[in-house]
Amino acid sequence: AHQLLTASLFRYQAHLFLYLESVGTALAPDGLSPLLDALLCPWPAAVGEALPRRWVAMQPYFYHDIPTTAGDWLRERHSGAQHGRIAVLKPDKWCSYMEYHLKLVSEGLLEGDRWHLISVQENLLFSYLEEPRTHVNIRHQPGVPSAELQEWLAVDPESHFEHFAKEQQGPDAPNFVYLPRCAGTHE
């Protein structure tokens, strides 16, 4: 069984990004909204499958905390407090970016927003964030310095990203675009 904790739908041009958060069995977007599914263009079938897909999963790889129970994870939410953003990796920097971020997660000491999640598909990164931010790390050891963060900062993080046009850029970096939230729970 699963329990849906939150859902948010974000848009960038003709692309939709659906963030689902649950405890228990993972949720799949197919069938959650048949009306929306009917509007989506089909993607080619995955290897080993016969039918085209309406949704393509992104792989989560970077986070600061892991939900264990709904009670542990639930909190007061505010409409408009959920944010989506995208970034595009330069093709020759994909492996480096992934290597450093997987090291940060494995180390578990980098403090960040409890509900921040980054997923990847090809060279596209999608981030989910919430306000107000609640800073934690995976090990739940606040204040312990991250050696992996120092290594990541030493390789010029900004060099890993394509930059968006000035009018698209997020408030904190030229390599992020904040996406409008179209729909979701907690409206």
Where do the protein language model's features map onto the residues?
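Short beta-strand-to-loop capping motifs
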Residues: 19-24, 87-91, 128-133
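A contiguous pocket-lining binding segment that forms or flanks enzyme active sites
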Residues: 113-116, 128
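Short amphipathic alpha-helical segments
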Residues: 1-4, 93-114
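An amphipathic, aromatic/His-enriched active-site/gating alpha helix that lines ligand/cofactor pockets
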Residues: 2-5, 22-56, 111-113, 132-176
